[in-house]
A protein has these predicted regions:
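Conserved AMP-binding/adenylation subdomain of ANL enzymes
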Residues: 1-5, 12-100
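Short, flexible loop/turn elements at secondary-structure junctions
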Residues: 10-16, 39, 118, 141, ...
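Conserved AMP-binding/adenylate-forming
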Residues: 56, 93-198
C-alpha cells in the first residue's frame, strides 16, 4: 500500500529484483528508494536506517554475511557460550541480539524475504531461534519468479514455504525412495517457452 516503504538494492535485471523491488512495489503504490550503489554492508546499513523499509527483499549472501561477520564471532566467545547455557540469561541474550539485528534492518519491517539461493542452515536456525522476522521463498525466472512462500510467522525451518494458491507442484521421480526427484510446476505465471526456441 501507499504507506509501505521499500529499499531496492537487488539487480533489476534479475527476475527477483524486478518482480519485487520494482513491479510489486510499483503496483502496490509503495514508496521505493533505489540504492544506486553496490550494496556494501556499510552502504546498505546506512540506507536501511534512513529508509526504514516495511518489507525487505534480499538474497542469502547478505544475511549470511551479517551472521558470519557480526553474530558468529560474538557467539563463539567462551564467555558467550557459557552465558547461552544459563537458563533465562540465554533468552535475554537472544532477545537482545534479535532487537539489535532488527534495528540494523531499520526496525520497521514486517518481514525480510530471502530468495535467489539456498540459505545457510546454521544461519537459518539461529535467526529462527531468536525470533527474527524472516522467511525464505522459492522461485525461478520462468515462473515470474515466485513458486512458494510463507509469511514469517508460518515459516517452517529448512522449507521454502507453501506453493502459491494459483500454482500446482509435484516431484517426479522414477524411484522416490532412492532417487532425488525433479520439481515440476504448473500455473498461470509459468512461461510457455523460450523465445525462438521451437
Amino acid at each position: 500500500d501507499s504507506t509501505s516503504r521499500c529499499l531496492a538494492f537487488l539487480p533489476l535485471a534479475h527476475a527477483y529484483g524486478c518482480a519485487f523491488d520494482f513491479l510489486t512495489a510499483f503496483c502496490c503504490g509503495s514508496h521505493t528508494t533505489y540504492l544506486g550503489k553496490v550494496p556494501s554492508p556499510k552502504i546498505l546499513m546506512k540506507a536501511l536506517s534512513e529508509v526504514k523499509p516495511t518489507v525487505i527483499f534480499t538474497v542469502p549472501l547478505i544475511i549470511e554475511k551479517i551472521y558470519r561477520k557480526q553474530i558468529q564471532p560474538m557467539l563463539e566467545k567462551k564467555s558467550m557460550r557459557f552465558m547461552l547455557n544459563v537458563p533465562l540469561l540465554d533468552t535475554t541474550i537472544l532477545a537482545t541480539i534479535n532487537k539489535k539485528l532488527t534495528e540494523t534492518f531499520g526496525d520497521e519491517f514486517k518481514e525480510v524475504i530471502i530468495g535467489g539461493a539456498a540459505l545457510n542452515p546454521e544461519a537459518e536456525e539461529f535467526f529462527k531461534k531468536i525470533g527474527f522476522r524472516f522467511t525464505v521463498g522459492y522461485g525461478m525466472t520462468e515462473c515470474a519468479p515466485l513458486i512458494s512462500h510463507s509469511f514469517w510467522h508460518e515459516f517452517k525451518l529448512h522449507s521454502v514455504g507453501k506453493v502459491l494458491p494459483t500454482m500446482e507442484a509435484k516431484i517426479l521421480s522414477n524411484d522416490p525412495q532412492n532417487e532425488v526427484g525433479e520439481i515440476i510446476v504448473r500455473g498461470e505465471n509459468v512461461m510457455l517457452g523460450y523465445y525462438k526456441n521451437e
